[in-house]
Amino acid sequence: MNVVVVGAGMAGTMLAIRLARRGHRVDVVERRGDPRGMNAPEAPSISIGLSERGRAALRDIGLLEKALATAVPMRGRIVHRSGRASYQPYGTDDTEVLHSVRRHDLNIALLDAAASVPRVRLWFGHRVTGLAGTEVRTPARTFSADLVVGADGAYSTVRTHLHRRVRAEFHRTYLDWGYQEFTIPAVDRPEALHVWPGRRGLVVAHPNADGSLTGTVFLPFDGDTGFSGLRDPARAGAFLAEEFGDLTDLVPDLVPQFLAHEPGSLVSVRTAPWQHDRVVLVGDAAHAVFPFYGQGMNAAFEDCAVLDACLAEHTPDDALAAFEARRRPHTDVLAELSARNFVELRDRVRSPVFLARKRIDFTLGRLVPGWRTLYAMISHSSLPYGDALARAHRQHRLLGGFVGLGGVTLLAAARRKRSGRC
């Protein structure tokens, strides 16, 4: 089968490798230039979290070891507030970790791996201008295929052309907050996600292999304490110092970095159907989500594994319908979880009641066989997102009883167990 994959990002390259290894011929069409070239622009230092779903996909194609070689394990989050830092572990043992990876480095590794597969051809600088059936048109050439995959991101061209053929539902939602990235020099305890929850903003920072952190500040776009109201250096400096405390001590040039670029937008995409007449969407083209659960790339990798399996099990036409049926309900759940986690990171990590509930949930995960936190099911397993949420709801109904009837006693017993006392 001849396959054209539009987009040479994470999902496109991952899928190309998988399909080519099954014997399909794959052309990957990318509008940008080759990022591996000598004249490629310098890549931004974006770091992202690699969870078990993403690790499983990389393991399948033999790239996990290479990806982890420059990754930094994140065993929990460190929350900074009022000059103090508290540690919240992600899992119950050393296997339940996330890994911070540089997006650019991982994309290069995937491109190199795709280029090494004889049945894959990479076409850079080819912008898709039309789609007729399974014929993909660019100004330079036309690609004929048996299957077209749109892996071209939240602003997908393939999706636009697909929607001209079929009655489609489409929802693009922008958060009224934006983001700006900056670099934090080396800090203590780098093997964690660092969070500064302010009253009017949020900073999240991923660790890098050199000991530094890649920070992201999230603020409203508008208002006196939003990006639009903080363009003056003195005003921005005063706000950042008041809102995020010790962060300004860690980053002497925080204000210049904060003002260096325009803030980016945060977008979520939902659409249906994902497929029609041998054209299918994967990754952000099908289900872009807000970044606050750290699952965008991981979900895209999982899409590739599921689509690959469906194509192996069914005829191409049936495979695409089976893929959408298996994935779309769960990525809809992920979109809800990602939006919800924004509220948790921004507001609830400061709440004593919320933190107590989290501690009880975490302790039950250590003491009660079969009990897993929602975060653990999402980040440390491959349980479908919807199944994980349903299981968490069942547990939380029980947890309400624990909180009312003995949560404090349970925590005290757990502390005694850890300290070796009876």
Region locations from a protein language model:
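Extreme N-terminal starter segment of soluble prokaryotic enzymes
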Residues: 1-4
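Conserved mid-domain beta->alpha element of the FAD-binding
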Residues: 8-21, 150, 182, 260-340, ...
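Conserved Rossmann-like nucleotide-cofactor binding loop
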Residues: 11, 34, 155
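Glycine-rich FAD pyrophosphate-binding loop
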Residues: 20-43
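Conserved N-terminal helical subregion
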Residues: 51-181, 233
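Acidic/histidine metal-binding catalytic segments
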Residues: 69-72, 121, 242-259, 315-322, ...
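Conserved FAD-binding catalytic core of PHBH/FMO-like flavoproteins
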Residues: 112, 126-129, 135-262, 266, ...
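C-terminal helical "tail/cap" subdomain of flavin- and related membrane-associated enzymes
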Residues: 309-422
